[in-house]
Design a protein with these regions (language model features):
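Short amphipathic helix-loop junctions that connect adjacent transmembrane helices
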Residues: 1-17, 205-222
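Pair of pore-lining "gating" transmembrane helices in MFS-fold secondary transporters
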Residues: 1-3, 7, 183-200, 283
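Residue-level signature of mid-helix packing/kink "hotspots" within the transmembrane helices
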Residues: 28-36, 86, 119-120, 232-240, ...
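Conserved MFS/SLC helix-loop-helix module at the cytosolic interface between two early adjacent transmembrane helices
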Residues: 32-69, 246-249
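Structural signature of the two symmetry-related core transmembrane helices
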Residues: 49-64, 143, 253-267
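Cytoplasmic helix-loop-helix junction between adjacent transmembrane helices
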Residues: 77-116, 299
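Symmetry-related core transmembrane helices of the 12-TM Major Facilitator Superfamily/SLC fold
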Residues: 137-155, 342-359
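Juxtamembrane intracellular "pre-TM" segments in multi-pass secondary transporters
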Residues: 158-189, 373
Length: 373
């Protein structure tokens, strides 16, 4: 996105960072507000319908992004894209209700791994297309891939309920936020998803900016894409491994280990002066944080009954979208001042997540009220 902003006429590095943050935040900001609404509609009328809505919107809006002529138009297109977002939490909800209870983390891990693999392949493929055919062509290719996914979804997917029968429309009562918050540790899971996504999206913005500031490096797009892709592969491995370990090791313990190890490594990226060092550190961070979203959603699946997971995962996705929206804004503002400072901030956020997990997980509500008073 920073490279496209520059192509659209923004040349000042500080303004590139700021616009990149605003554009990256636009879609999740809208999606975060509407995600719970679509989650409740999915529980009531079927998750397949919501998945179709999301992909169909992506096909049109992403193609339009390849046609914009100003950074303001791109920002508006990203806002409109938020009206069709919510694909990932719906896919997570489908996976959580389709798998046996003891295999829910593995099912969620598979969905998350597919998403991470798209992050791995996307920047490298997008960098190649952008280098040889222009950045606009990358948007058209992405829209075409979404169209293929839409056809496959319509033709091949049959939605089932947790009992294994077809989902009757209009069968589920809506789950409101105040009801979701009554589930033990629901708010903590929401916070962990926010933190995990905040860190991931922040690094996705910082890597291209960091590489662009490295002296003597010309292939900025290709190098940035390679670093992001390799880190995403590491995160995919971590997600799969964490999902399988969760069948024998408590999920909060796995999350704690990842956050405590990944925080200092994230801050250490501030010391990277060349792309090889940045690549190694980003890969290690991916190994530590790759399973965070998977494990947090698996915790959510343990907390919420299957018939309400569409709405519940919509509310949990609010944490993801808030993290996705606020991270580019915060990281863009910090990077405009100091890129190393932004890395350190991400590392501190990871340690805050570990502290929240250590203090709040499993504590009775009465004990928490006593601790606050």
């Amino acid at each position: 996105m920073p490279l496209y902003v520059r192509e659209l006429g923004v040349t000042d590095p500080g303004r590139i960072a700021l616009w990149s943050g605003l554009i990256a935040a636009a879609t999740p900001a809208v999606s975060g507000v509407l995600g719970p609404v679509f989650g409740r509609l999915a529980d009531r009328f079927g998750r397949k319908l919501m998945l179709i809505r999301s992909l169909a919107g992506f096909v049109v809006i992403i193609a339009i992004m390849g046609l914009v002529t100003s950074v303001e138009q791109l920002f508006v297109a990203r806002l409109v894209q938020g009206l069709f977002a919510g694909f990932t939490p719906m896919a997570m909800a489908v996976a959580s209700v389709s798998a046996p209870r003891d295999k829910v983390p593995v099912a969620i891990g598979i969905v998350q791994s597919a998403q991470l693999l798209s992050v791995a392949v996307g920047p490298a493929a997008g960098g190649y297309v952008a280098s040889h055919h222009g950045i606009r062509a990358a948007f058209f290719v992405t829209a075409a891939l979404c169209a293929v996914a839409l056809v496959g979804l319509i033709a091949l997917f049959r939605e089932v309920s947790p009992t294994g029968v077809a989902v009757p429309r209009g069968s589920a009562a809506p789950l409101r936020m105040r009801q979701a918050l009554r589930y033990p540790n629901f708010l903590l899971v929401l916070a962990l998803l926010l933190i995990g996504q905040f860190i991931d999206r922040g690094l996705a913005l910082l890597i291209p900016l960091h590489v662009a500031h490295m002296p003597g490096l010309e292939a900025v797009a290709a190098t940035s894409g390679a670093i992001i892709s390799i880190a995403a592969v590491a995160a995919t491995v971590s997600s799969n491994l964490a999902a399988r370990l969760a069948r024998g090791i408590p999920i909060p313990k796995l999350l704690m280990i990842g956050l405590l190890a990944g925080g200092p490594l994230c801050a250490a990226m501030a010391l990277a002066h060349g792309w090889p060092t940045l690549l190694v550190l980003r890969t290690l961070v991916g190994l530590c944080f790759g399973g965070a979203i998977t494990l947090a959603y698996a915790l959510g699946a343990e907390i919420v009954p299957g018939e309400h997971r569409g709405a519940a995962f919509g509310w949990l996705a609010l944490g993801v979208q808030v993290g996705t929206a606020t991270s580019p804004l915060a990281m863009g503002a910090l990077a405009a001042v100091s890129i190393p400072l932004a890395y350190v901030f991400d590392g501190v956020i990871a340690l805050v997540g570990a502290a929240l997990l250590a203090f709040f997980w499993g504590r009775p509500r009465a004990e928490l009220r006593d601790a606050r008073s």
